[in-house]
Amino acid sequence: MVKIGVLGLQGAVREHVKSVEASGAEAVVVKRIEQLEEIDGLILPGGESTTMRRLIDKYAFMEPLRTFAKSGKPMFGTCAGMILLAKTLIGYEEAHIGAMDITVERNAFGRQKDSFEAALSIEGVGEDFVGVFIRAPYVVEVADNVEVLSKHGDRMVAVRQNQFLAASFHPELTDDHRVTAYFVEMVKEAKMKKVV
């Protein structure tokens, strides 16, 4: 069974743990740097990206997260997690982890009161997935090697680049675990490649 970490500094941690377990993987709440060595994949949960960055810096997680990104193990960022994975952020000079060749705009769908749900078609996942958008970012631009998995209107809201997956919405806030299951499969495939 693969072991998937959920970065436990802030955000929808419990919900991700539940979704990972429902998808047939072991979930670990990552609160210490050394735990990164024990896991096969990592979820960066939604939350407040500025607060999350402050906590990442406070607990000296940034370099270990960048090292994890370079290790070939899959990472999945939802909402604020997408912001952490992006190489370019509109209105900001520097990236956070910067592992994905995507340009992201923060709070692109408006503030908390503008939160909404929308039925999405997601490549590799299926139709009618309810995307929960809460002060969500969206992907403005992608490099050629980034696969766009879903759009809401003309806005890119789910993307994949090799072992990295990112979504504007919160898949963990529904009882539909298909997006998490997709990530679990990515982790299983990556682990199999390592073994071979």
UniProtKB/Swiss-Prot annotation:
One of its GO terms (cellular component) is cytosol. Pathway: Cofactor biosynthesis; pyridoxal 5'-phosphate biosynthesis. InterPro entries: Class_I_gatase-like (IPR029062), PdxT/SNO (IPR002161), PdxT/SNO_CS (IPR021196). It catalyses: aldehydo-D-ribose 5-phosphate + D-glyceraldehyde 3-phosphate + L-glutamine = pyridoxal 5'-phosphate + L-glutamate + phosphate + 3 H2O + H(+); L-glutamine + H2O = L-glutamate + NH4(+). The active site is at C79 (nucleophile), H170 (charge relay system), E172 (charge relay system). Keywords: Glutamine amidotransferase, Hydrolase, Lyase, Pyridoxal phosphate. GO terms for biological process: glutamine catabolic process; pyridoxal phosphate biosynthetic process; pyridoxine metabolic process. Disulfide bonds: none annotated. L-glutamine binds at G47, E48, S49, R106, I134, R135. Signal peptide: none annotated. Its EC number is 4.3.3.6, 3.5.1.2. Pfam families: SNO. One of its GO terms (molecular function) is pyridoxal 5'-phosphate synthase (glutamine hydrolysing) activity. In the presence of PdxS, forms a dodecamer of heterodimers. Only shows activity in the heterodimer. Catalyzes the hydrolysis of glutamine to glutamate and ammonia as part of the biosynthesis of pyridoxal 5'-phosphate. The resulting ammonia molecule is channeled to the active site of PdxS. Belongs to the glutaminase PdxT/SNO family. This is Pyridoxal 5'-phosphate synthase subunit PdxT. It comes from Bacillus cereus (strain ATCC 14579 / DSM 31 / CCUG 7414 / JCM 2152 / NBRC 15305 / NCIMB 9373 / NCTC 2599 / NRRL B-3711). The gene is pdxT.
